[in-house]
Design a protein with these regions (language model features):
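Hydrophobic alpha-helical transmembrane segments in multi-pass integral membrane proteins
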Residues: 103-111, 160-172, 216-232, 271-286
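Hydrophobic alpha-helical membrane segments
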Residues: 98, 213-214, 233-248
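Hydrophobic core segments of alpha-helical transmembrane domains in multi-pass membrane proteins
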Residues: 62-71, 118-126, 178-188, 231-242
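Transmembrane alpha-helical segments that form the membrane-embedded catalytic/substrate-channel core
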Residues: 74, 192, 243-247
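Hydrophobic, membrane-inserted alpha-helices
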Residues: 43-47, 98-105, 157-166, 187-191, ...
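N-terminal topogenic module of multi-pass integral membrane proteins
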Residues: 1-142, 257-262, 269-286
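Cytoplasm-facing juxtamembrane segments at the starts of transmembrane helices
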Residues: 31-38, 85-97, 137-160, 176-183, ...
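Membrane-helix boundary connector in multi-pass membrane proteins
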Residues: 226-228, 248-259
Length: 286
């Protein structure tokens, strides 16, 4: 009797299949994209527009700059962590936004400038924060495009040039601090570029260190022997940095070709021409 009940209970009616338990898909956090990045950049612009206010002293503006840098950095850390960007704790994701904020704040503290110049600097700051972080975000999602490398190089170069000009034209900074600042700016910007060419932190840091040392040595020579203004020297230093780091990036990436050597070598030739022109002229140009 029991065997009959067991066989009847185990037998299903014809046409009816035994239902399989469905496995629930793993819950994946919603990825954040350009809307979040645009909102973060807009908040940075809104806060940065207050840097030119006459109600703040320079020390208070520096404190506000540090606070804005921390705010933007934490926002980008949350963005990359939520999207599971590879190596989201690496400093190269946050170098350009922080340097851009410092450059915009320094322009805002210039007393002789009209309010439109600091406002334009803050707007450019917001666009650079968005562009540089968008490149990192797209690269982390596997959506890298050829234009992204141009955006990365353009934002890094422009911020580098602005900071070089600010440091060189500052009369309050001692000479030692000027060259130290140039070294740090070139080091961080170079590390940002070299991290795109290699995943090894040591190689990127060593390449950035050599690039920064070369640029700082060139700055010392030009400030000492060239009778030129800060704008002229800043342009030469930025071109020299761009040529050196460009050749090094492609050498690390194993993509160095004759065309690339010609393109970056052209910047080196321009630097040599500008230095020779200043030496021959012997007076400020422009």
């Amino acid at each position: 009797m029991s065997e009959a009940l067991a066989s009847s209970s185990a037998t299903l009616p014809p046409g009816q299949l035994r239902a399989r338990p469905r496995s629930r898909p793993a819950v994946r956090p919603v990825q954040l994209g350009t809307r979040y990045l645009g909102l973060l950049s807009a908040w940075a612009v809104a806060i940065g527009l207050g840097f030119k206010s006459e109600l703040f002293t320079p020390n208070q503006i520096w404190l506000a700059t540090a606070g804005l840098s921390i705010f933007v950095t934490l926002g980008l850390v949350f963005l990359h962590a939520r999207n599971r960007t590879p190596a989201w704790l690496s400093l190269d994701h946050y170098i350009t936004p922080v340097l851009t904020i410092v450059a915009a704040a320094t322009f805002s503290m210039q007393p002789a400038l009209d309010y439109r110049v600091p406002a334009l600097a803050v707007l450019i700051m917001g666009s650079f924060i968005f562009a540089s972080s968008f490149v990192d975000l797209s690269r982390g999602m596997g959506r890298e495009r050829p234009l992204h490398r141009f955006l990365r190089d353009a934002t890094t170069f422009c911020v580098l040039l602005a900071l070089f000009y600010i440091v060189l034209q500052s009369n309050d900074l001692p000479v030692v601090f000027k060259f130290s600042a140039i070294f740090v700016i070139a080091l961080l910007s170079g590390y940002r570029s070299f991290r795109f060419a290699t995943k090894r932190e040591g190689v990127a840091l060593l390449s950035a260190f050599l690039t920064a040392g070369t640029v700082t040595f060139g700055a010392f020579g030009m400030v000492t022997y060239l009778n030129q203004g800060s704008q002229y020297v800043a342009v030469i230093l930025a071109f020299a940095w761009y040529a050196w780091q460009g050749l090094t990036v492609h050498a690390l990436d194993d993509s160095l070709s004759r065309r690339i050597m010609f393109e970056y070598g052209l910047f080196a030739v321009i630097c040599v021409y500008l230095i020779a022109l200043a030496l021959v002229t012997g007076r400020p140009i422009g």
